[in-house]
Amino acid sequence: DFIIFFIFMFFSPSCILSQTLQESGPGTVKPSESLRLTCTVSGFELSSYHMHWIRQPPGKGLEWIGVIATGGSTAIADSLKNRVTITKDNGKKQVYLQMNGMEVKDTAMYYCAREYASGYNFDYWGQGTMVTVTS
């Protein structure tokens, strides 16, 4: 029984395919410039999950930016609706955040997260990428 358990634990797909999210971006942008961030995922199919962008300014709480659904439709926070676009490429396993007209107050750690059930429940987060807006 132990041998069967050992084989199952170490060779089952769920153990082999770790599920990760990794954000990447420029690090620093100037005021009025545009920001483009990429979230690269592995271990699961983007087409099966809603993906969110969230940020946390220094010393403040988390702020939801927006979501792209499995079919590609998006919802953006009202305060950012005119500045943010979220897209994805299922084949490349990448989700993109485009934010225009960057301001100093947009300085924050930016995260992508996977929604596993309706109601903004997140089971996997990236480690985040820091974006600093400075001249």
Curated annotation (Swiss-Prot):
Domain Ig-like: 20-128
GO molecular function, one term: antigen binding
GO biological process: immunoglobulin mediated immune response
UniProt KW Cell wall biogenesis/degradation keyword: no
Coiled-coil regions listed: none
GO CC, one annotated term: extracellular region
Signal sequence, renumbered to the chain: 1-18
CDD domains from the UniProt entry: IgV_H
Alphabetized UniProt keyword annotations: Adaptive immunity, Immunity, Immunoglobulin, Signal
Any Pfam family hit: V-set
Protein's UniProt name: Ig heavy chain V region XIG14
Record lineage: Eukaryota, Metazoa, Chordata, Craniata, Vertebrata
